Amino acid sequence: MSLSRQSCGRVVRVTGRASARGLIFVIQVYRHMLSPLRPASCRFVPTCSQYAVDALTEYGLLRGSWLTMIRLAKCGPWHRGGWDPIPEGLTTGRSCQTDVDGANDDWNPASKRGERESFV
């Protein structure tokens, strides 16, 4: 079976998301049965459990688990907390690159477009 360039890794992402459902179920059990027994102490918005559900839903089992582990590593007195949503727009690999010959100017620095870098 050969995948066309149009599928662009979607089979892998769908499989990862489907396998993440079991872990999301475990997180939901924690959120609804164990978490209410403890006082609210999460220093992040969204909470770490909501972050995990969002990351697993958006990025699948492997990348979502990795993002969740990074977030949980921040949980402690050494981090001030605050607003920390899941990152948007993570690429899935070079095979899915749609920008050809610098057609996307959003990522080209001003100096490469012949513009000044600052107005001052």
Swiss-Prot record:
Sorted UniProt keywords: Cell membrane, Membrane
UniProt-annotated location(s): Cell membrane
Topological category with respect to the lipid bilayer: Peripheral membrane protein
GO cellular component entries: plasma membrane
Xref: NCBIfam families: membrane protein insertion efficiency factor YidD
Protein's recorded name: Putative membrane protein insertion efficiency factor
Annotated family: Belongs to the UPF0161 family.
UniProt cross-references to InterPro entries, sorted A to Z: Membr_insert_effic_factor_YidD
Domain of life: Bacteria
Native source species: Mycobacterium tuberculosis (strain ATCC 25177 / H37Ra)
Start and end residues of each stretch annotated as Disordered: 93-120
Function recorded in the entry: Could be involved in insertion of integral membrane proteins into the membrane.
SMART domains to which the protein is assigned, alphabetical: Haemolytic
Keyword Ribosomal protein found: no
